[in-house]
Amino acid sequence: MRKLGFCFGKDQSAESPSSLKIDIVIPAIEKDLDTLPYVIDFARLNVLHPISNIYVISPDSEKIKQVCTAKGCIQIHEESFLPFRKSDIDYRVGGVDRAGWMYQQFLKLSANCFCTEENYLVLDSDTLLAACRT
């Protein structure tokens, strides 16, 4: 994957074509630990806006905290800014519990509660930006 990032990444010496600072928000859980470091790396490599902060919203997890520390990101506990928990949501589609998906949507939409920039980009923890994006 590093080779792919190098091949498609922007020239690190080039100036950013945008002066609009943004924050990046990535909701994650422990099952995302295999991809999370790459999501962070590819975002830094391929987002053409100056990035102020990268926030990882997650449950209280030492493993995710370690990734955040190693990658210079800020971990936000998912229960620290919404007035309800995932367990408060009763949402089923075709008999399948979709409360986790619904909760994730609320987390994404509420990121303005902690982001320092007016504008922010939300990336899912399984989304690698393989080419430059504004």
Each language-model region and where it sits:
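N-terminal anchoring/stem segment of glycosyltransferases
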Residues: M1-R85
